[in-house]
Regions:
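Cys-dependent protein tyrosine phosphatase-like superfamily
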Residues: 19, 29-143, 158-200
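Helix-centric, low-specificity signal for extended rod-like, repetitive segments
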Residues: 3-4, 21, 145
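Short alpha-helical segments used as structural interaction elements across diverse proteins
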Residues: 7-8, 25, 149
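Bacterial N-terminal signal peptides
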Residues: 15-25
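Bacterial N-terminal signal peptides that target proteins for export
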Residues: 3-17
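Hydrophobic alpha-helical segments, especially transmembrane helices
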Residues: 11-12, 29, 153
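A phosphate-binding catalytic loop at a beta-strand-loop-alpha-helix junction
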Residues: 143-155
């Protein structure tokens, strides 16, 4: 019969402890690597440029030919036009505005779409799909997509890229958060929309 001494038992316990710590560290490193990989995948899918300032706006997010931001004024749209901009997509309800944006945009010689997305209601998938289809219809011309603060515009970006690239829910939310989505309630609406599926 094999007899273990106190020193042997202590040595075994120390070895077990060291091995457990090693496995725990490996698990944490693996989880961190997976997170970095996930972030890298999202980053590789689209290249997001932060333009600061942009006309009279503090910042605008650019993804290829698309610009996403809060409410622009005439000077901002003039700057957009100077960059070759041709189209403006407004996601605000007309009742939110105290001026005629359609008239202002047309006076600048730009095309105009208005797809109202009420800020306090669930996001209507049909409206978001219509926005995505309009972006596709316009082709490669520079397009300025906006709402009041940029949150709804970031949701529109997520929907468009999900249709175009087949993003996962996590990828779509991540890209939105890096493109102006800061409001917690709007984030919840985006997740609910993606879970339900993009059906008209």
């Amino acid at each position: 019969m094999k007899i273990f001494t106190f020193k042997q038992n202590r040595r075994n316990l120390v070895s077990l402890f060291v091995w457990s710590v090693f496995l725990l560290i490996c698990a944490k490193v693996s989880a961190a690597d997976e997170q970095k990989l996930s972030e890298k995948v999202s980053t590789d899918i689209v290249q997001i440029k932060l333009l600061k300032p942009f006309g009279n706006l503090e910042q605008v997010y650019q993804i290829e030919n698309l610009y996403f931001a809060g409410q622009p004024d005439k000077a901002t749209l003039e700057h957009f036009r100077s960059l070759g901009g041709e189209t403006v997509i407004n996601l605000r309800d007309p009742s939110e505005l105290k001026f005629n944006e359609r008239l202002m945009v047309h006076d600048l010689g730009l095309r105009y779409y208005n797809f109202p997305v009420p800020g306090k209601q669930p996001v209507n998938p049909s409206i978001m799909l219509a926005t995505s289809w309009a972006i596709e219809h316009e082709g490669k011309v520079p397009i300025f997509v906006h709402c009041s603060s940029g949150n709804r515009a970031a949701v529109a970006l997520a929907v468009h890229l999900t249709r175009k690239l087949g993003l996962t829910q996590d990828e779509a939310v991540s890209i939105s958060e890096r493109s102006g989505l800061t409001h917690p309630n709007t984030r919840k609406k985006l997740i609910a929309l993606l879970k339900e599926g993009l059906k008209p």
